A protein has these predicted regions:
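GGW-centered surface loops in extracellular recognition modules
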Residues: 1-5, 10, 128-131
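Disulfide-stabilized, aromatic/cysteine-rich ligand-recognition loop
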Residues: 200, 206-208, 241-287
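Structural recognition of the beta-strand scaffold that forms the well-ordered cores
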Residues: 2-3, 30-35, 78-81, 132-134, ...
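Short, well-ordered junction/capping motifs at the entry into regular secondary structure
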Residues: 121-126, 170-216, 268-271
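Active-site microenvironments of metalloenzymes and redox enzymes
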Residues: 25-166, 173, 228-229
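Short, polar loop/linker segments at the starts of domains and inter-domain junctions
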Residues: 11-28, 54, 186-205, 260-274
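Proline-centered structural pivot motif
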Residues: 50-57, 176-178, 227, 238, ...
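Cytochrome P450 core scaffold surrounding the K-helix E-X-X-R motif
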Residues: 11-17, 223-236
Length: 287
């Protein structure tokens, strides 16, 4: 886990968590250096008796995921095809293993008979010290390096800027992340490859200023928040609305979208029961 010092952010962007007219105060928190890997997910979930967490998703399947890139370990690729409900359930399981207080209260669980939690009643208590999903604001703050006084804060990607930032195809992404025009070799081409390796082992690209890897590209990351319009004004540790239709995802992916979608200010959203092979997550903790 990487320690992140909170602070005050006076927004000046047109999109993202720190828009013009929004003043955010964030408390200190920590965030995982890497996305949750298949190996970690399997170890935490394999003996679960309450919900079938389909740990077999963590086993290599070339037909489903494509060939592993030479030199990479499948166990160190990010776990994927996890719903938002699966992610919060994992956080509680890991908290219990580490003897921390679970952050989430989860009840009324319903699952797909094959593998995934598709419905549950979930609430969070941020006074608890266990693992959790980062809020959207925490995620963006960490992705931008956690320091508004340095140039990294204004980079388009997490840990890198580019003269072509905002373009569909951008070799400036090659240093820090995987997207659909470099997903086969790690080097941007002018076309989307006809075959791809899928996700890649975590930590192979350059980290950002905080030492956090793969926050631009790779796979989209679930955040806690329901999708909502970001409002102006002053706010302390925002967590978004209490209800909604879709949960926020951040970061971009190897498959969905161009380099533009890997920017640290951009968001995707999806129904919390959705699970697909370019959705995953990383974990956070309050301090």
């Amino acid at each position: 886990m990487i320690s992140v010092n909170g602070g005050d952010v006076y927004g000046h962007d047109t999109i993202g968590a720190f828009i013009e007219g929004r003043n955010v105060t964030l408390s200190d928190f920590s965030i995982s250096k890497y996305l949750v890997t298949r190996d970690l997910y399997f170890k935490v979930m394999y003996d679960d008796k309450d919900v079938n967490a389909w740990p077999s998703r963590c086993e290599y399947n070339q037909t489903y995921r494509g060939e592993i890139m030479e030199g990479e370990k499948d166990s160190l690729r990010p776990v994927e095809s996890v719903s938002w409900f699966d992610a919060v359930y994992f956080c509680n399981r890991l908290s219990k293993i580490k003897e921390y207080e679970p952050v989430y209260s989860i009840s009324d669980i319903k699952r797909n008979t094959v593998y995934s939690i598709i419905s549950a009643t979930v609430s969070q208590d941020l006074t608890k010290n266990g693992y959790r999903l980062p809020t959207e604001t925490e995620w963006e703050y960490a992705a931008r390096g956690g320091d508004v006084t340095v140039e990294d804060w204004n980079f388009y990607y997490s840990g890198a800027d580019s003269e072509n930032a905002g373009a569909a195809i951008d070799s400036g992404m090659d240093a820090v992340g995987w997207y659909n025009c470099n997903a086969e070799t790690g080097v941007t081409t002018r076309r989307i490859p006809s075959t791809m390796h899928g996700s890649h082992q975590v930590g192979l690209k350059k980290p950002n200023r905080l030492g956090v890897y793969d926050m631009s590209g790779g796979i989209f990351e679930w955040c806690w928040d329901w999708e909502h319009a970001i409002s102006t004004g002053s706010t302390l540790d925002p967590v978004g609305p209490d209800s909604g239709g879709k949960k926020v995802l951040r970061g971009g992916s190897w498959l969905h979208g161009w380099a533009i979608y890997c920017g640290v200010r951009l968001r995707l959203s999806s129904e919390p029961q959705t699970s697909t092979d370019y959705y995953g997550f990383r974990i956070a903790r309050s301090k």
